[in-house]
């Protein structure tokens, strides 16, 4: 299961989405992670707790012309870009 770490929130600023550390996390993670609407779509699933497979399925459903290999690659890259804000639970 992939989920957002406690203390990370998403805020929309103009046309961009920012993942921001709050509370104690703000003391150790002083950056802002910028993403787009697709990233926000994934983030909302991650906030609730999801699996990699569910992210892939949701992406392919949302973007009908997206093939599985590309979805897997894109989601892997997205998860790497937001790695400070997520955790994997077995």
Regions found by a protein language model. Give the residues of each.
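Acidic, low-complexity/disordered tracts enriched in E/D and polar residues
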Residues: 1-44, 89-90
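Long, charge-rich, low-complexity alpha-helical segments
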Residues: 31-90
